[in-house]
């Protein structure tokens, strides 16, 4: 596996991986915003099914809004991919109260993808806990055990938001419960310390050169008349949050 990954990386002029963790195999894909990330990972599922027969996929997203957008993308592109591959992916949004869909996901040999937001399995509420509970309505089984038994392929959309900065937070720990075959991480802005086994990079300049985006705008700031004896302002950091963006000025 390592040699195959290294060959792909060298062909793409990316830094080759020195080692891999086969117990937690992750591959990083960097794609500039607006270049078709969702389309790409849907096509990746079809190709993995075509080449290797893998049929169980889970897309993990950071919010309900993104979850709904991904679900809509599957609906919109359904005909396109069906025409190309001659089959359809059965997609559904995870709901702790609709357990029959999990049974279908696990037992059906066709391609299935479950779309789930982090709050549905990593929050502290009762709904989030149901996935780890033996449920009478589910023949005294735990939904997570049924899902994990399929050895799904995890696709993490916007991992910098899904995983967060804390290396031991609840989301990271709970993701291990899915026991994935491997994990694909798709984003334009990966956290530097979460980049592992980069196999594809489409940055802003590449996207512009390939005419996938219209233009790149860069704003410069010049300082005039400075004698270097006075204080000065500099951008210390940009703080990302669910609210308005904030910058820290030093």
Regions found by a protein language model. Give the residues of each.
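RecA-like P-loop NTPase motor core of helicase/translocase proteins
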Residues: 1-250
């Amino acid at each position: 596996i390592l040699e195959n990954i290294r060959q792909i990386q060298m062909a793409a002029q990316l830094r080759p991986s020195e080692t891999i963790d086969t117990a937690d195999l992750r591959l990083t894909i960097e794609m500039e915003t607006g270049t078709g990330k969702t389309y790409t990972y849907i096509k990746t599922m079809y190709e993995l099914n075509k080449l290797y027969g893998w049929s169980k996929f889970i897309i993990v997203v950071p919010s309900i809004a993104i979850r709904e957008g991904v679900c809509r993308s599957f609906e919109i592109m359904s005909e396109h991919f069906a025409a190309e591959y001659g089959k359809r992916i059965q997609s559904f949004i995870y709901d702790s109260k609709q357990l029959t869909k999990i049974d279908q996901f696990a037992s059906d040999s066709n391609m299935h993808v479950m779309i789930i937001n982090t709050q549905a399995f990593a929050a502290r509420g009762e709904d989030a806990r149901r996935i780890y509970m033996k449920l009478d309505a589910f023949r005294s089984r735990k939904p997570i055990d049924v899902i994990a038994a399929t050895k799904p392929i995890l696709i993490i959309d916007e991992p910098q938001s899904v995983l967060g900065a804390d290396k031991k937070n609840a989301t990271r720990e709970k993701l291990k419960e899915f026991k994935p075959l491997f994990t694909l991480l798709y984003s334009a802005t990966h956290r530097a310390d979460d980049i592992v086994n980069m196999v594809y990079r489409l940055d802003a300049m590449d996207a512009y050169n390939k005419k996938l985006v219209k233009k790149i705008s860069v704003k410069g700031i010049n300082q005039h008349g400075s004698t270097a004896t006075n204080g000065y302002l500099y951008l210390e950091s940009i703080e990302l949050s669910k609210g308005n963006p904030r910058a820290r000025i030093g």
